[in-house]
């Protein structure tokens, strides 16, 4: 706060990508190879997600985690992500690192993912090597493993926002659409490969005997894939850094209407005014006569309170998109998090609570294995569908894709719940892939279109001498969408267990997923705003 004027501190940043004043520079068209390299981060992330889905439950059970702490493991990560996601998204909008705004955050979160995997896949081995007291070993093993799971989930959920914002910053609108389709394609391929490797019995293979256990084998593959994918991703497309121009320019006169300035300070997204290449157009200064170059960014000193107020004041069409994303992820996670358990108990009629050498438990394990193959089918079909999405858009538009994704998933899960047959269930897993591809592409395409429309409006206002008052950074908008994933995890983790206990059967899981998806159909058709 400046004591002499009573106004909040204001810093101005300028993108090194632009030189001329009053001109908005369109990023160059990106070759397919660069977009594929950019998508490798999604491949690596989803590969590690699949490994976690296949191994985290056996790992937690092997270290003796009490059932009372099981829900804590799955709730801690989304709660932390929901609270911190917008903060990091906003901070990345005005990061001044020399190699860009998004890549430093992506690198840090990638390292956190690697550390989380190291802890939850090797926690028991680490503790056995460090602690000799058998009475202390279980407590430390549980603590280390839980920390690893929470850290990995937190970073893996978190990283989606900066990756999407990175794509939006450096690409034209057409390349953004292409990039999102490649993201969905490689997300499915990464998940499929992760599930396939998780289905192999490494204990009876030479590599398993060499590394010790199948947990160490999967850590070897996961760390190798994740490291290579993120190196390729970070080298895919250069980012233009922001530089601080406050030291190079004389102080400006304070606005004549401080109250108006104070009100704008808490508008949605007003905590950062990013002008980095294609991200934002011309900026008209308050006062009317002087304009900043379009590559400038005005950043006010922010607090958590101001950030929350900014998010609460988001425009209606952004809010509706976030709600539809929340409904979609609630439906999707309701099914995916409990699908293998549904296969073991309902489809195969096994019993997870019986003795481990009993026929009922072995049948349950067989159902879980087949459920993993169903998730593999989901990943493969997600990749295929993401490829065909580009061909479908000219005919049905984004509205048709959004509606169709929710509808097919709702009908597919409903059919599985009503007719729990092995073969029909595996066939219906293709509808999971449609929903997955839809959630990873359409909402972010809409965000890109909203920003493109706002850029055109702001450019027209700047040419006409008007005042630009509705600027947002794409990092914050992507983070707001990603927050809905964490909120959906909180709702599913806290609510579905209660429903299962009340009903007495896990069939309520797929019925809930179906109902939520069909409600989402109505919402995306009636309330989400689409741009032709």
UniProtKB/Swiss-Prot annotation:
Membrane topology (Cytoplasmic): 1-45, 90-105, 160-184, 238-319, 389-399, 448-479, 528-532
Example of a GO MF term: sucrose:proton symporter activity
One example of a Gene Ontology biological process annotation: visual perception
Residue positions the entry lists as glycosylated: 357
Subcellular location(s) per record: Melanosome membrane
Membrane topology field: Multi-pass membrane protein
Cited SUPFAM superfamilies: MFS general substrate transporter
Top-rank taxon, per record: Eukaryota
Reaction(s) the record says it catalyses: sucrose(out) + H(+)(out) = sucrose(in) + H(+)(in); D-glucose(out) + H(+)(out) = D-glucose(in) + H(+)(in)
Residues annotated as transmembrane: 46-66, 69-89, 106-126, 139-159, 185-205, 217-237, 320-340, 368-388, 400-420, 427-447, 480-500, 507-527
Primary localization class, coarse: membrane
Keyword DNA damage carried by entry: no
GO cellular component: melanosome membrane; membrane
Known partners and oligomeric status: Interacts with TYRP1.
Function: Proton-associated glucose and sucrose transporter. May be able to transport also fructose. Expressed at a late melanosome maturation stage where functions as a proton/glucose exporter which increase lumenal pH by decreasing glycolysis. Regulates melanogenesis by maintaining melanosome neutralization that is initially initiated by transient OCA2 and required for a proper function of the tyrosinase TYR.
Protein family membership: Belongs to the glycoside-pentoside-hexuronide (GPH) cation symporter transporter (TC 2.A.2) family.
Designated name of the protein: Membrane-associated transporter protein
Gene name per UniProt: SLC45A2
